[in-house]
From Swiss-Prot:
Species this protein is from: Shewanella oneidensis (strain ATCC 700550 / JCM 31522 / CIP 106686 / LMG 19005 / NCIMB 14063 / MR-1)
Biological role stated in the UniProt entry: Catalyzes the tRNA-independent activation of glutamate in presence of ATP and the subsequent transfer of glutamate onto a tRNA(Asp). Glutamate is transferred on the 2-amino-5-(4,5-dihydroxy-2-cyclopenten-1-yl) moiety of the queuosine in the wobble position of the QUC anticodon.
A GO molecular-function descriptor: ATP binding
Record text on cofactor binding: Binds 1 zinc ion per subunit.
GO cellular component term, pick one: cytosol
Official protein name in the record: Glutamyl-Q tRNA(Asp) synthetase
Motif window: 'HIGH' region: 21-31
């Protein structure tokens, strides 16, 4: 039975969560942990759970991966609400906001190379914003006036990031013309009405930049809940880029229970995937999830 939504989570309305994979390869165990954690959180609060495919980086995408991800989620018993949102269908919205930010002097073009930024100490110093004749091409950076340096995570507690990282004017459109993750994720979470972002701790620092962008855009930010990362060794997470093994679509029961154990939850009877998820939702306890950024997997 689903728990009653608490107003502490989303005073503006019903809980809305999401899982937003990139189609750069098949889902692996780390992906399953993120999907499961966000699903259990949303369903245990009686909320909606949405799927978004973050397909705005074609050089990293694998043909057919988006469909494979959806079929894998189905094989694991996940049921999502509404239609799947593809970021590639949202580029007009991204560009409209970029144009608005540029017109308001809340963003500017930058032509500094990585080598030049390294010479600045690795943190960009905003020099292109000070030019008498501004650039009209290159990467686009946000004028980071909000400079959010800390926030409260609903699992990890108070999160504080490095001052230089928090104050840097960060890129919101790349020099190759592709929209940066920070811009797309903020606009899409706002567009979909996401009330709480549940994802891995590899993105925990990025939340401060996203909060700065929310303020610049005049948008209401969601709450945050970052889950432990599945790592092979300290600092080396399972990822598609690291060629992590795809989870088995034919036999989901063992992987589901392994992911539940990883999240500190009790295992469930290995019946159908859908029945397992229903039981896992009914007994989900956020307080049991380990409050650590990494968990090293053992053989």
């Amino acid at each position: 039975m689903m728990a009653t939504l608490t107003t502490a989570i989303s005073p503006q309305g019903p809980y809305v969560g999401r899982f937003a994979p990139s189609p750069s390869g098949a889902l692996h165990f780390g992906s399953l942990v993120a999907a499961l954690g966000s699903y259990l959180r949303a369903r245990s609060l009686g909320g909606k759970w949405l799927i978004r495919i973050e397909d705005i980086d074609p050089p990293r995408e694998v043909k057919g991966a988006a469909d494979d991800i959806l079929r894998t989620l189905e094989a694991y018993g996940f049921e999502w609400d509404d239609t799947v949102l593809y970021q590639s269908a949202r580029t007009d919205a991204y560009q409209a906001k970029l144009d608005q930010l540029l017109a308001q002097d809340d963003a500017y073009f930058c032509q500094c190379s990585r080598k030049q930024i390294q010479a600045m100490g690795g943190i960009y110093d905003g020099r292109c914003h000070q030019l008498a004749t501004p650039h009209q091409s290159g990467a686009i950076r946000l004028v980071n006036r909000a400079q959010v340096a800390e926030f409260t995570d609903n699992l990890m507690g108070k999160v504080v990031v490095d001052h230089d990282f928090a104050t840097e004017d960060f890129i919101i459109k790349r020099s190759d013309g592709l929209y940066a993750y920070q811009l797309a994720v903020v606009l899409d979470d706002a567009h979909q009405g996401i009330s709480e972002v549940v994802r891995g701790c590899d993105l925990i620092e990025a939340s401060c930049r996203q909060l700065s962008l929310y303020q610049s855009l005049g948008l209401t930010a969601p709450q945050w809940l970052h889950l432990p990362l599945a790592c092979l060794t300290p600092g080396f997470k399972l990822s598609k880029q690291n060629h992590a093994q795809a989870i088995d679509k034919q036999h989901p029961q063992a992987s589901l229970n392994a992911a539940l154990t990883f999240l500190g939850q009790s295992t469930v009877e290995p019946t159908s995937a859908a029945q397992m998820l229903a039981q896992a939702v009914a007994q989900f306890e956020l307080t049991a999830v380990p409050k650590q950024r990494e968990i090293i997997l053992t053989a």
